[in-house]
Regions:
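Conserved helicase ATPase core of P-loop NTP-dependent helicases/translocases
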Residues: 63, 247-248, 253, 261-300
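Conserved SF2 helicase motif VI
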Residues: 319-340
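SF2 helicase catalytic motif II
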Residues: 91-136
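Conserved pre-motif I regulatory segment
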Residues: 1-27
Length: 408
């Protein structure tokens, strides 16, 4: 069986092979869900007598990619970045013809990065291909890993916004809701009380009171879920911040989800749990009429793909743009023609505007495609965003503006 590539991946593959011939290195920066690992598997398939060393953050990611492909490769030796680090002494014995660096932005981590450097120095003739949804390490001084590892040799680059605009990924329905806002209101109250001008204090307290009332009048999560989760026996991935946060969210399942479907099954996946593989496998094969929720922490941010997902639910404090896009990307799959649901449940006011970054990417892609005379590649220019707390966001922005100018 030969690997068939979607048009966008075939174009990227052609650029990769040309660049590898010319430069010996190439990076592909495509969003989650577009199937970029297939580009590397295709390369291995086309060069059966060449030896490939495939590095990735976890064996789990690699095994899932192979399972989804339904193929085996005799010419690929797999190794996780941490295993490479533990076996640094045997790097000299590897002698690959090709090195695949999957999720290559992770090579910026101090220890992993050192062993990857050592490998690249030990194999100067090996061609290297990097795959990632992002080349920037946002929380690490904006380091550009495509520059550091591939000398800026990018064979193909696409943002999440462009992938949606071009119809490579389906346009989602995006719902923004809010919960547990008391702490946020308390912090705003303290900022107001710290003002020196009594007139300003009174004015801002009025705004805060309006905001509090608007939040109290907004629908609770039970009604938000009941209204928007229309695939009542669908599969949803629920992202949480940590184990404690996950346990708290799971404790609310009966009150929040019973209006969607009284029969709910909860699966849990997190990296320290030995039962994760089984839970994940059961979730993937569950075809029952129950509402299926897979609660996870850090398992599915990158690399792992699940078929037949109806949507994702993000219960999140503020997170890096990389993780935010990876989590959204779990709901979007190339070749899928349904409208996936993204429920973004934030516990801070800043989180209400996260989606604006993606909307900006889409507008940028639209302008660029029109400017390049490629308007015919535009499939959609925007997607539906439902703000359950629109008034709250507007009031919060007014209050922020007022408080900022009060401090100046």
């Amino acid at each position: 069986m030969s690997i068939h590539l979607f048009k966008h991946n075939q174009e990227a593959y052609n650029s990769v092979t040309a660049m590898l011939e010319r430069e010996k290195m190439a990076a592909v920066i495509h969003p989650t869900g577009t199937g970029k690992s297939l580009i590397a598997f295709k390369l291995a398939e086309e060069h059966p007598s060449e030896k490939f060393l495939w590095l990735s953050p976890s064996e789990y990611i690699y095994q899932t990619q192979l399972e989804n492909l339904g193929m085996e490769f005799d010419n690929i030796q797999f190794m996780s970045y941490s295993r490479l680090m533990k076996n640094e002494d045997s790097i000299e014995t590897l002698h690959p013809d090709y090195i695949i660096l999957d999720e290559f932005h992770r090579c910026g981590a101090a220890e992993w990065g050192k062993s990857v450097r050592k490998l690249l120095n030990a194999c100067p003739n090996a061609k290297r291909l990097g795959l990632s949804a992002t080349n920037i390490r946002y929380l690490d001084n904006q380091r550009n890993m495509a520059e550091e590892i591939f000398d800026g040799k990018i064979a193909s680059e696409m943002t999440l916004g462009e992938a949606i605009v071009r119809g490579i990924l389906p346009e989602p329905k995006y719902v923004i809701a809010m919960y547990s806002y008391k702490k946020e209101l308390d912090q705003l109250k303290k900022r107001i009380q710290a003002l020196s001008n009594q007139g300003l204090i009174t004015e801002n307290q009025k705004l805060l009171e309006q905001l509090r009332r608007a939040l109290e009048q907004a629908d609770g999560l039970d009604l938000v879920f009941q209204h928007h989760i229309t695939q009542t026996s669908g599969k949803y991935i629920v992202f949480c911040a940590n184990k404690e946060h996950m346990d708290e969210m799971i404790s609310h399942v009966p009150e929040w989800f019973s209006g969607v479907n009284p029969d709910v099954v909860v699966y849990e996946a997190y990296s320290d749990d030995p039962n994760t593989d089984k839970a994940f496998a059961d979730f993937k094969t569950d075809t029952s009429d129950r509402l299926k929720l897979l609660f996870c922490i850090d398992m599915l941010n990158e690399g792992v793909h699940v078929e037949g997902i109806s949507g994702v639910i993000l219960f999140r404090p503020t997170i890096s743009p990389i993780i935010y896009k990876q989590q959204i990307g779990r709901a979007l799959t190339a070749g899928d023609n349904t409208t996936p649901l993204i429920l973004d449940v934030v516990n801070n006011f800043e989180g209400l505007t996260s989606i604006s970054g993606l909307q900006g990417e889409m507008q940028e892609a639209v302008h660029r495609l029109y400017a390049n005379g490629e308007g015919d590649r535009i499939v959609t220019e925007r997607f539906e965003v439902v703000e359950q707390v629109h008034d709250c966001r507007v009031l919060f922005e007014r209050l922020q503006e007022s408080l900022s100018s009060s401090w100046e």
